[in-house]
UniProtKB/Swiss-Prot annotation:
It is an enzyme of class 3 (hydrolase). It comes from the Eukaryota. The active site is at residue 197. It comes from Colletotrichum graminicola (strain M1.001 / M2 / FGSC 10212) (Maize anthracnose fungus). Secreted metalloproteinase that allows assimilation of proteinaceous substrates. Gene3D superfamilies: Collagenase (Catalytic Domain) (3.40.390.10). This is Extracellular metalloprotease GLRG_06286. Keywords: Disulfide bond, Glycoprotein, Hydrolase, Metal-binding, Metalloprotease, Protease, Secreted, Signal, Zinc. Zn(2+) binds at residues 196, 200. GO terms for molecular function: metal ion binding; metallopeptidase activity. InterPro entries: MetalloPept_cat_dom_sf (IPR024079), Peptidase_M43 (IPR008754).
C-alpha cells in the first residue's frame, strides 16, 4: 500500500537545499542536514502526531526498494575493494534482516563491477554516479568503494530532485567496502554501516542530532543524546536532565556493529513519511 502525504508547497521546495553542506571525515560522512531540511522534519513530526491514524496506516504498509550494488575497486582483489559475491549476498541479507521489522525490503536488481582507481578512492563522485547510477529516485544505489577518506560511508537525504539534476545523480549511499560482512574493518564489518546510511536515505538523522536541547533528531521516541557513542556503552546518559539513556542500540548512533539492534516505531513512521513524500 502506498500512502502519499502533501506538505506545504514551500517546504517541498526547501528540500532542494538538503544536500548542501560539508561531509566530515570520521565515522559517517553524511552531510549535516540543513536548517531547511530540519524544518521539514519538524513539520513531518507535527503531521505525524496530528494524523496518527493515517500515518499509522502508512507505517503498517510495506515498501520494496529496487536496489543496485556498484563495486568500484582499484584492482581485482578484495584488499583493493573488489569484494566477493558472497560478501554482497551477506550484505543484502543484513539489510533485509534489519529493515524487515519495519515492512521494508530490498530487491537486488543488478550488481556492477568497475575497476577505476580514482573512483575507488571517492574521486570525481558525480562522474562516477553519472556513469553507474540505475533506476529512478525510488531506487537505492549503493556504491562500495575502497577508500572514503577515513569515513565508513555517506548518503543523501530525500530531496526534491528532477531527473538529470546533480541532486538526482548523487542520490544513494557510498560505503567503505571493508565494512560489509567479512570485511577487514574491525568492529564494523557486520554490514551495519549500510543499515545506518540507508537510514539517512530514508530521511533519518543521527540520534545525537541537536544534542540535549531543542528538537534533536525530530523523533519523539529517541532519547536526547549529546554526542555519538563509541563502542557499546550500556547505560550511557549524555543528557542526564532529559528522559531516558542514550539510544546506543539504535542504528542511527555511532556504536559498533554488534551493538546495533533497532529503529524505533517513530523512526519507522518517519521513513515512510519521507519515502512517500519524495521517493514513491
Amino acid at each position: 500500500m502506498q500512502v502519499t502525504f502533501t506538505l506545504v508547497a514551500a517546504l517541498a521546495g526547501m528540500a532542494s537545499a538538503a544536500v548542501a553542506g560539508e561531509r566530515g571525515s570520521f565515522g559517517c560522512a553524511t552531510h549535516e542536514p540543513t536548517l531547511e531540511h530540519i524544518e521539514i522534519s519538524k513539520k513531518l513530526a507535527e503531521e505525524e502526531a496530528t494524523n496518527a491514524t493515517l500515518f499509522g496506516l502508512a507505517a503498517a504498509a510495506t515498501i520494496t526498494v529496487p536496489t543496485y550494488f556498484h563495486v568500484v575497486a582499484s584492482s581485482q582483489t578484495v584488499a583493493n575493494g573488489y569484494i566477493t559475491d558472497k560478501m554482497l549476498s551477506d550484505q543484502l541479507a543484513v539489510m533485509n534482516e534489519d529493515f524487515a521489522p519495519h515492512g521494508i525490503s530490498f530487491n537486488l536488481v543488478q550488481t556492477t563491477r568497475t575497476i577505476n582507481p580514482t573512483w575507488a578512492r571517492d574521486g570525481d563522485e558525480l562522474a562516477m554516479k553519472r556513469s553507474l547510477r540505475k533506476g529512478d529516485y525510488g531506487a537505492l544505489n549503493l556504491y562500495f568503494l575502497r577508500d572514503i577518506g577515513g569515513a565508513f560511508g555517506y548518503c543523501y537525504f530525500p530531496t526534491t530532485a528532477s531527473p538529470g539534476s546533480a541532486s538526482y545523480i548523487r542520490d544513494g549511499c557510498t560505503i567503505l567496502s571493508s565494512t560489509v560482512p567479512g570485511g577487514s574493518s574491525t568492529n564494523y564489518n557486520l554490514g551495519r554501516t549500510v543499515t545506518h546510511e540507508v537510514g539517512h536515505w530514508f530521511g533519518l538523522y543521527h540520534t545525537f542530532q541537536g544534542g540535549c536541547t531543542g528538537s534533536g533528531d525530530s523523533i519523539a521516541d529517541t532519547p536526547a543524546q549529546s554526542s555519538p557513542s563509541s563502542g557499546c556503552p550500556v547505560g550511557r546518559d549524555s543528557c542526564p536532565n532529559q528522559p531516558g539513556v542514550d539510544p546506543i542500540h539504535n542504528y542511527m548512533d555511532y556504536s559498533i556493529d554488534s551493538c546495533y539492534e533497532e529503529f524505533t516505531p517513530n523512526q519507522q513512521t518517519r521513513m515512510y513519511s519521507f519515502f512517500n513524500q519524495y521517493r514513491a
